[in-house]
C-alpha cells in the first residue's frame, strides 16, 4: 500500500513538473517570438533609433581594440 502511494506521489510530482515546464516553455517561446518579430520589424529603423537615443542620452558605443 505504501509503495503504491509513493509511486503515485512520484508520478503526480513528475506530471506537475512537466506541466510547469511546459507552461514555462510556452511562455518563453511566446516571448522569444515577440522579440524576434519586433527585431524583424525594426531591422531598418533600429540604427536610426539607436543614434537618436544615444545622442539624447549622450551614450556612446565604445569599442576597445588591442593590437599586439
Swiss-Prot record:
Pfam families: DUF4560. InterPro entries: SMIM10. Expressed specifically in salivary glands (at protein level). PANTHER family: SALIVARY GLAND SPECIFIC PROTEIN SAGSIN1, SMALL INTEGRAL MEMBRANE PROTEIN 10. This is Small integral membrane protein 10-like protein 3. It comes from Mus musculus (Mouse).
Amino acid at each position: 500500500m505504501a509503495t503504491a502511494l509513493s509511486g503515485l506521489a512520484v508520478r503526480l510530482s513528475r506530471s506537475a513538473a512537466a506541466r510547469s515546464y511546459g507552461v514555462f516553455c510556452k511562455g518563453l517561446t511566446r516571448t522569444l517570438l515577440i522579440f524576434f518579430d519586433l527585431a524583424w520589424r525594426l531591422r531598418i529603423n533600429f540604427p536610426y533609433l539607436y543614434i537618436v537615443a544615444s545622442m539624447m542620452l549622450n551614450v556612446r558605443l565604445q569599442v576597445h581594440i588591442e593590437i599586439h
